[in-house]
Amino acid sequence: MATIICKRNRFNVVYSYYDEAGKRHQKWEAFSTMPEAKQRKSEIEYKQQLGSFTIPTCNTLNELLKEYVSLYGKTKWAINGYSSNTGLIRHYIAPKLGELRLKEITPRVLEMFYQGLLKTPAVPLMTDKKYRQTGKFVQPPTIRKIHNLLHSAFKQAQKWELIEKNPAEFATLPKYEMKERNIWDSQTLFHAIDCCEDERLKLCLNLAFSCSLRIGELLGLTWDCVDISEESIATGKAHIVVNKQLQRVNKRSMEATDSKDVLTTFPEIGLQNNTVLILKKPKTRASIRKIFLPKTVAENLTKWKMEQDFLCEKRKINLPLVIRFPCYFPKSMVK
């Protein structure tokens, strides 16, 4: 059993355990909010009932990161966040710092590590061609992600009373200037629409611009979230509801996070694929929104719906996706 004790504006989860010699000890884990403490308390009690509860006892950074991913990452990270963070650990952190004892890691050690990364070849991206030699080194934005990951891991180590201070708190990062993202102006958009000959792509451009949709939200839009009835269009109330998104995720990461927030999994084309397409819930509740459609876009959607209904009837499929894409039909969509 575990209890929660509030002390100095901190919520402490307190529980007892026995060491290998049979001696009883008391453990305190500090959290900044009551919901976090309650979640940890429930997790401890559940694992104690199953007989699978273990006390975090980490000597090296590799051991800490293993506990951190298991206890924190699997419950807090989204699927792609899990893939990204475990990749940073595997490719950059573990080879350089993994065998260091926690007491040996200081702000100076981290700063030297960050400077060394600037001269370390970057791991190729999935989108790079196979066997392509990019010749690129790890960039400051990636180093910032690594720093944030280490900061979070050391913060958890503080809560578990494995370290007294967070060394990442005082480490200085390499200079980084954020580049402004180039965006289209209205003239460029209208020119692109005029030049576009693919009706599906033209509809995507109109939806993305008029509704400010991310690509995952656009491709994850389903007809049950679209109101384009004659009455709605006539009264200016035609709208869409954004409540899910299409995403490609790593299959192992999806299994590790227990398919968290996954609504639909699309069938795989190849047996050797490491990734799979899914429909998932948005990252935050704020991403769920109702967006009213301009009349011209609503009329374009009506025309597109008629064409898609004809296709579905011809192929004997039930396809609720607004923007269809070949070969990806969930089993639940096939009659």
Model-based region annotation:
Residues K7, V14, Q187-T188, L221-M306, ...:
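Conserved tyrosine-mediated DNA breakage-rejoining catalytic core shared by Y-recombinases
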